[in-house]
């Protein structure tokens, strides 16, 4: 019989942290799961750390990419091999509360494709909770994702596998904000609901984070703005220009990016954002002229 939930974990050079993540999975009150851990061609002993769990529990499955494909590529590898009707994508350095799987699974109804939960943000250096992701996602959330009124973290969503496959999985060319890209696309075909309970500890800080840096942040923002440009400009132009201005300000901070990176970002910015700004400036000019005509 196939398991009810497939947990998919990408791992790259995670030998120091992945064991605690997998131990938390073993502690789940919901037992009918498989966990596919995808080693993204690591250079350290990540494989050996994973194989210790595979050896003691057959629910763990080891997969390995022949070349490094990034977190999204590893997630797609896991999705391709998943057997369950429900999938949960999880990061290799975060922790599940023991009732995560049971709580999300029992919260599903026939008219829902995605169940999300809340997440605590834990600072590694301070070893304490510093924030909470307590966004509420109900029904069709496509509009709310574009306007940034809601957010869905990678870890916090149990999803029907067929809707993941329907949108083609994760975008492997997305530099950052992969979960934003994924759920903008997923929300076009899926209906969401939120279990208002903290069930995950999301760790930030320290020297072992997977994705960090101004360069990747801006490149990811520009990727999203370019990919969904028409949707932003039609429904939420202010969100589009707000993110554009934030990206521009980060590019100007040369302390955070080197010259080569800055040149690449400026080129992306010119190609993606500048034409829309020209349209905005033109519209503002028409508005000013209209106001002058009204005053006369």
What residue spans do the PLM features occupy?
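Cell-envelope/extracellular polymer assembly enzymes that use nucleotide-activated donors
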Residues: 3-6, 34, 181
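Short, well-formed alpha-helical segments that are part of the catalytic scaffolds
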Residues: 14-27
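A conserved acidic beta->alpha catalytic loop
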Residues: 24, 31, 39-48, 67, ...
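Glycine-rich, basic loop-to-helix element that forms the pyrophosphate-binding segment
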Residues: 65-82
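Short aromatic/hydrophobic "clamp" motif used to bind/position activated sugar donors
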Residues: 87
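Conserved donor NDP-sugar-binding/catalytic core segment of glycosyltransferases
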Residues: 99-130
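Conserved nucleotide-sugar donor-binding catalytic segment
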Residues: 135-225
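C-terminal subregions of glycosyltransferases and related glycan-biosynthesis enzymes
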Residues: 203-296
């Amino acid at each position: 019989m196939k398991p009810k939930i497939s947990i998919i974990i990408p791992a790259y050079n995670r030998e120091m942290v992945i064991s605690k993540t997998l131990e938390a999975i073993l502690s789940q009150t919901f037992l009918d799961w498989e966990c596919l851990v995808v080693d993204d061609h690591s250079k350290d002993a990540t494989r050996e750390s994973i194989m210790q769990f595979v050896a003691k529990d057959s629910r763990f499955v080891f997969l390995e990419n022949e070349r490094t494909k990034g977190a999204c590529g590893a997630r797609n590898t896991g999705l391709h091999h998943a057997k369950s009707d429900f999938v949960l994508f999880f990061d290799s350095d975060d922790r599940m509360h023991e009732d995560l799987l049971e709580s999300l699974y029992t919260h599903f109804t026939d008219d829902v494709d995605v169940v999300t939960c809340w997440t605590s943000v834990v600072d590694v250096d301070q070893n304490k909770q510093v924030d909470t992701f307590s966004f509420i996602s109900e029904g069709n959330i496509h509009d709310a994702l574009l306007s940034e009124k809601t957010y869905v973290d990678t870890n916090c969503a149990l999803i029907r596998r067929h809707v993941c496959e329907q949108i083609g999985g994760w975008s492997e060319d997305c530099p950052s904000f992969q979960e934003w890209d994924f759920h903008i696309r997923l929300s076009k075909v899926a209906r969401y609901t939120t279990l208002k309970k903290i069930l995950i500890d999301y760790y930030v800080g320290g020297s072992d984070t997977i994705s960090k840096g101004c360069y990747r942040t801006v490149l990811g923002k520009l990727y999203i703005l370019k990919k969904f440009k028409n949707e932003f400009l039609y429904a939420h132009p202010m969100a589009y220009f707000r993110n554009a201005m934030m990206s521009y300000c980060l590019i100007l901070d040369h302390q955070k990016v080197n010259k080569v990176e800055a040149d690449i970002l400026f080129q992306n910015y010119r190609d993606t954002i500048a034409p829309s700004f020209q349209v905005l400036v033109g519209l503002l000019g028409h508005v000013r002229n209209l106001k002058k005509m009204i005053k006369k």
